[in-house]
Amino acid sequence: MLAVRCDQLVEVNSKAHTLIKERMPGQATLLLEEWEGFYGLPECGRQIVGKTLVQRQKQVQEKENEVGSNSKRFLEEIATQAGFKVRVVNHYPHHCLRDCTYPLYEQANHWRIFMYTPAVSSIRYATCLDDVVKNLTIFERNKELECLLKRYQYAHLEFVFIYEEETQ
């Protein structure tokens, strides 16, 4: 009686063994899309096209092992891995233990992290035809970079993105 179901049992058993390997995101093949969805990959609408299975598995594994932080080094590494150039600066407020020559940053800057990055498009200066409430320099913001870094932002902090002209 079991001879009829033998092939089906072997198939179910082999699928069960492959699903055991799927528990680890770095080894997943069948459930790789589900793991990517769970970890929010690809981040900020970036495309998966062109990535091999091994690269996708590695990316999911890195995301699983990642420990978030708002340290300068961590944020710069995340931006560099995504292909962006960022310089992170913290302006801490003055207190009595600092040197007298330390700049007097306002207290609100204690909760801000400043991100200096090159502007995406060429910067153009405002003209008399622009609205009064517009900034004096007009440029395109790098929304992909902002989305990527704001995913790691703690609730009590504010990321301030400052776009600079690239010096040649």
From Swiss-Prot:
One Pfam family of this chain: Phage_Mu_Gp48
InterPro entries noted in UniProt: Phage_Mu_Gp48
Family to which the UniProt record says this protein belongs: To phage Mu protein gp48 an E.coli YmfQ.
Name this polypeptide is given: Mu-like prophage FluMu protein gp48
Species of provenance: Haemophilus influenzae (strain ATCC 51907 / DSM 11121 / KW20 / Rd)
